[in-house]
């Protein structure tokens, strides 16, 4: 009888072990769904897998369940790459959790209107979990936020939909962009760890780090990261070098050079890639690109994080959503500073610059919305109020190391550098917001703006016609979407008009004003497309 080889038995044992493990996990998952009679289960889903966020939400959920023993809160963290497919499947299948994180780029108007419940009325009521806070107890829930949930321009706030004129989410945090740096490496290279105050000092620091690496033979890069990280720097530089141009182009004269205005003014020829301020903004990449890691265009966000945490990169530009992971995992002291702007008197980049861009308009992030198929909508809203109370928001910020969003909540120790810069000027023109394909064009041709052969002229020659078409395509798409939105809102307006005043009439007035604005924007877009037809 032929003996069965040892490795065959080993493979069989591993297969059997895997089967047993999977069976146990499946049994545990199913038993968790069995709840005692009368227990209300609230499920909350999000894609924030950064260290500290899930722990913070778990801690707050435990506090809530201790206060309400008949309630169970279940957190559902979903990987970002699978989020969109998972979200649509859950909503269409009627199996969506009670609370879902919202983002305007993931939740179009039709999705919000069909699958989510507006929370505007609840936001106008006091938050009972602030009853012990004298300055908050009588305020509407909306006004307990540091920025009082003012609707964001262009819908970038995620929690409010300008077309539907409703609040759909209650945010949990603020996010800013900072350059994180390894204090030990900076001290070794420069003798101190004072963060740079100007762009020239930033470039000088990069040069000092590069020379330090050459002297010591260490495999060290001044700047770590990928395209994801580098665009956090270029966005700041683009937005400051072109500030005066934005003021010239802002025909609404409201200091908010919106995406709509940006695209229409481009299509009308009021500015282009050849405009001196825009051309100069493209040259900013060349000024620091020689300090980027080899192959950075092909690297991913995770690669940049690993470079920094392993001490192979001295600095990393990213959002404060990564702060918790950096501060918890780094085995070295970490500092942070805002991407330094150009001064007005900068010999090369100061001509169209006003100064540091204000972050006062930083809008609240990570909003959770209430789904229409929630079995316990009042309970879900109650938990959302608890999550965004002053006490819970302080705990969330302390554990996650993210910025607080509620009035009076202190910034956690060690994160003071993340606070939004209140003073400053309006932002300028950023070519990355020129329609859906504009960002892809930049990413695909980034190599023309960096390296030994960097040339803004070559970039413009290669991409100008691509931008021309991308902008017109985006204007046409926006006009179609606006037309559909206006059509849908007409029936809502008719219903509100015949509803008894006064409260519904107030909403009618607001919706009518928004409707007129949408129609104006659509007519402007159609006129531009008539004058500059797509070929």
PLM features: what roles do these ranges have?
Residues 2-22, 424-535:
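Conserved C-terminal helix/tail region of periplasmic/extracytoplasmic solute-binding proteins
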Residues 37-51, 71-76, 99, 168, ...:
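Short, well-ordered beta-strand elements
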Residues 50-70, 180, 184:
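Short, polar/charged alpha-helical segment
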Residues 72, 188-189, 303, 328-402:
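Extracytoplasmic/periplasmic substrate-recognition and gating elements
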Residues 77-86, 199-201, 296-310:
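Short helix-initiation/N-cap motifs at beta->coil->alpha
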Residues 107-176, 347, 353:
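Hinge/lid segment of periplasmic solute-binding proteins
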Residues 203-206, 248-298:
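Glycine-centered hinge/linker elements that transmit conformational signals in sensory
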Residues 211-214, 273-345, 379-388, 394-395:
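Ligand-binding pocket segment of bilobal, Venus flytrap-like solute-binding proteins
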């Amino acid at each position: 009888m032929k003996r069965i080889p040892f490795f065959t038995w080993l493979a069989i044992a591993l297969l059997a072990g895997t089967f047993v493990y999977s069976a146990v996990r499946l049994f545990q998952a199913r038993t968790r769904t069995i709840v005692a009679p009368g227990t209300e289960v609230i499920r909350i889903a999000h894609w924030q897998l950064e260290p500290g966020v899930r722990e913070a939400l778990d801690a707050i959920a435990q506090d809530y369940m201790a206060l309400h023993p008949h309630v169970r809160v279940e957190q559902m963290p979903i990987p970002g790459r699978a989020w969109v497919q998972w979200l649509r499947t859950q909503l269409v299948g009627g199996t969506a959790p009670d609370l879902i994180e919202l983002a305007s780029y993931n939740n179009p108007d039709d999705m919000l209107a069909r699958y989510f419940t507006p929370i505007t009325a609840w936001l106008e009521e006091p938050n009972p979990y602030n009853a012990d806070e004298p300055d908050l107890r009588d305020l509407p829930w909306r006004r307990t936020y540091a920025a009082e949930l003012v609707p964001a321009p262009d819908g970038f706030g995620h929690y409010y939909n300008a077309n539907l004129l409703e609040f759909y989410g209650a945010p949990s945090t603020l996010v800013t962009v900072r350059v994180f740096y390894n204090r030990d490496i900076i001290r070794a290279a420069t003798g101190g760890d004072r963060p740079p105050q100007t762009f020239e000092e930033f470039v000088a620091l990069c040069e000092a780090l590069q020379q330090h690496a050459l002297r010591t033979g260490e495999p060290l890069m001044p700047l770590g990261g990928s395209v994801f990280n580098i665009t956090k720097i270029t966005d700041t530089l683009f937005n400051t070098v072109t500030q005066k141009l934005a003021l010239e182009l802002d025909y609404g004269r409201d200091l908010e050079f919106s995406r709509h205005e940006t695209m229409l003014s481009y299509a009308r020829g009021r500015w282009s890639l050849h405009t001196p301020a825009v051309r100069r903004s493209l040259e900013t990449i060349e000024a620091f690109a020689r300090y980027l890691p080899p192959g950075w265009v092909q690297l991913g966000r995770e690669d940049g994080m690993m470079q920094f945490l392993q001490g192979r990169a001295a600095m990393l530009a990213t959002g404060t959503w990564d702060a918790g992971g950096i501060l918890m995992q780094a085995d070295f002291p970490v500092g942070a500073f805002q991407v330094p702007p150009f001064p007005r008197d900068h010999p090369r980049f100061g001509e169209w610059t006003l100064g540091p861009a204000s972050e006062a308009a930083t809008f609240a992030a990570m909003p959770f919305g209430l789904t229409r198929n929630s079995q316990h909508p009042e309970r879900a809203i109650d938990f959302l109020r608890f999550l965004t109370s002053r006490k819970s928001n302080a705990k969330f910020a302390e554990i996650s190391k993210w910025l607080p969003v509620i009035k009076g909540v202190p910034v956690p120790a060690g994160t003071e550098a993340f606070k939004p810069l209140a003073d400053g000027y309006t932002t300028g023109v950023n070519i990355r917001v020129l329609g859906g394909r504009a960002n892809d064009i930049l990413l695909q041709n980034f190599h023309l703006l960096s390296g030994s052969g960097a040339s803004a002229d070559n970039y413009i020659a290669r991409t100008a016609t691509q931008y021309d078409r991308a902008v017109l395509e985006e204007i046409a798409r926006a006009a179609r979407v606006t037309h559909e939105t206006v059509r849908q809102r007409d029936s809502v307006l008719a219903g509100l008009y015949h509803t008894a005043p006064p409260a519904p009439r107030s909403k009618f007035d607001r919706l009518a004003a928004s409707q007129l604005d949408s129609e104006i924007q659509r007519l402007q877009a159609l006129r531009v497309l008539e004058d500059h037809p797509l070929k």
